[in-house]
């Protein structure tokens, strides 16, 4: 099931310049999701990170992983219109390859555990078949107040 940017914006609240998932390529409800982020030089982080050699910040790669996981949660629950997804913890984040404008980040997130409103994930980012980043993280789903 491919999910385009319009549906992504219906599923998660993030918007430019902080929407970091361009398309979902594959989803297996309650299990895993694959998506992409096309990295372009026009993104605001590259004006300062770094002007002479733009490099995608590692923290934004982790954020892209978390946003993709939030899409998986929304689709698995049927809707998150009355809910909010909050990142609680990031564990074992590792960055193995520079990501720069012109690259396509292939993001994969897998649910490791889900108990009540707490979800644990493992996620990776690859570029041109090479591991660029990996992380484990925990998110909490809460009712909107």
Swiss-Prot record:
One of its GO terms (biological process) is fatty acid biosynthetic process. Its main location: cytoplasm. It comes from the Bacteria. This is 3-hydroxyacyl-[acyl-carrier-protein] dehydratase FabZ. It holds the Pfam family FabA. Disulfide bonds: none annotated. It is found in: Cytoplasm. It is an enzyme of class 4 (lyase). The active site is at 49. It catalyses: a (3R)-hydroxyacyl-[ACP] = a (2E)-enoyl-[ACP] + H2O. GO terms for cellular component: cytoplasm; membrane. The gene is fabZ. Involved in unsaturated fatty acids biosynthesis. Catalyzes the dehydration of short chain beta-hydroxyacyl-ACPs and long chain saturated and unsaturated beta-hydroxyacyl-ACPs.
